[in-house]
Amino acid sequence: MDSKTDNKRLCVIIPTYNNVRTIRQVVMDVRQYCSQVIVVDDGSTDGTSAELSSLSELITIVTCQPNGGKGHALVAGFRKAREMGFTHAITIDADGQHFADDIPAFLGQLDSHADAIIVGARNLTEENMPRGNTFANRFSNFWFRLQTGIDLQDTQSGYRLYPLGALRGLGLITSRYEAELELLVFAAWAGTPIFSVPVKVYYPPADERVSHFRPVYDFVRISILNTVLCVLALVYGYLRMAARAVRRIFA
């Protein structure tokens, strides 16, 4: 496989909010592997919008005003990707933590697992990995396994490949970054296969890091969301998964 794909079915979506220091390099790195790039500017106020304008001949820009959260930005990106005729999208964060040279790892799964969501699993022991992120990820992994029966290594990774058709009809409760967890849970209940591929991750030193994660507030939001998802699992998710299992037995 060539290092760069011109697969007309696939694009890369980059949601961004105030990433002026990293967005240009992320875009240029991604374009080495995929020529179709959609950047969703989620109400940036720091010069990111001007930086994207200078790249407008290389990318498709979707602008959301005001800032609505990562989940809102992803939904806008998925909508644009479907409008442009794509069937699959890779999502990658704009802060530079993901390596574009891992894109071929996702592409290598596309033909044999076209109906699956593929999650890039990070090494959570990497240098400079925030301790709060490690705890939050393990916490999220536990609840995801309880809600779906699926053991996934990194439920909070934003580096993913989505089959866009599998996202149709999946309503979201939240619009912030925890919406990525919702997408996985609802997709699992709908029968979409979900598995991981290992990816690299880079976390800059704390004094250079741009983070929109608010430990106490966001932990409370995630806890409330998981409570709601557990209730939904009892009254809907488990029943739907059980019905599929019965159909497979008698198929």
Identify the residue ranges that each predicted region occupies.
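Acidic helix N-cap motif at the loop->helix transition within catalytic regions
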Residues: 21-25, 46-54
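Cell-envelope/extracellular polymer assembly enzymes that use nucleotide-activated donors
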Residues: 9-11, 36, 182
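Short, well-formed alpha-helical segments that are part of the catalytic scaffolds
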Residues: 17-32
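Short hydrophobic beta-strand elements that form part
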Residues: 11-15, 38, 63
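A conserved acidic beta->alpha catalytic loop
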Residues: 41-50, 96
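Acceptor/aglycone-binding surface of glycosyltransferases and processive sugar-polymer synthases
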Residues: 65-83, 88, 100-177, 204-223
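Hydrophobic helical membrane-anchoring modules
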Residues: 1-7, 149, 172-251
